């Protein structure tokens, strides 16, 4: 088991934030028609993976990746709702609840 420190948790948080930013820029780039926003998206993804690489030095890969992906998806759904007026249907909400439950189970394992 690796030594978990606040440092690793902070890098995981940064990776999550950068993933959300990347997704927002990707949506705003309109399929890379706005090249500079597409490039900002790519840079954000690179930053997210770099931060995740630092996080997994102290957090098990399976836990870090599940939390990164899960929180990234949940927050991207919220950002889509707030910024772009996108709404989930009933199946989408069920999927989000299952995703969050899975993250809790993985963290407790």
UniProtKB/Swiss-Prot annotation:
How is this protein situated with respect to the membrane?
Multi-pass membrane protein
Q: Which domain of life is it from?
A: Bacteria
Q: What is its main location?
A: membrane
Q: Which GO terms describe its biological process?
A: glycine betaine transport
Task: List localization entries.
Answer: Cell inner membrane
Q: Name one GO cellular component term.
A: plasma membrane
UniProt keyword list: Cell inner membrane, Cell membrane, Membrane, Transmembrane, Transmembrane helix, Transport
What stretches pass through the bilayer? 6-26, 35-55, 64-84, 88-108
A Pfam family name for this chain? Answer: Multi_Drug_Res
MF-aspect GO terms = amino-acid betaine transmembrane transporter activity; antiporter activity; choline transmembrane transporter activity; spermidine transmembrane transporter activity
Q: List the disulfide bonds.
A: none
Complex formation = Forms a complex with MdtJ.
Q: What does this protein do?
A: Catalyzes the excretion of spermidine.
Give the record's family classification: Belongs to the drug/metabolite transporter (DMT) superfamily. Small multidrug resistance (SMR) (TC 2.A.7.1) family. MdtI subfamily.
Can you name this protein?
A: Spermidine export protein MdtI
Q: Which organism is it from?
A: Serratia proteamaculans (strain 568)
């Amino acid at each position: 088991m690796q030594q978990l420190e606040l440092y690793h948790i902070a890098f995981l948080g940064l990776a999550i934030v950068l993933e959300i930013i990347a997704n927002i820029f990707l949506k705003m780039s309109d399929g890379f028609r706005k090249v500079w926003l597409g490039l900002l998206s790519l840079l954000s993804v690179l930053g997210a993976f770099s931060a995740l690489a630092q996080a997994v030095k102290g957090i098990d890969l399976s836990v870090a990746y599940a939390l990164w992906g899960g929180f990234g998806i949940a927050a991207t759904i919220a950002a889509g709702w707030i910024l772009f007026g996108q709404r989930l249907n009933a199946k989408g909400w069920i999927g989000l609840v299952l995703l969050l439950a899975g993250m809790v189970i993985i963290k407790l394992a």
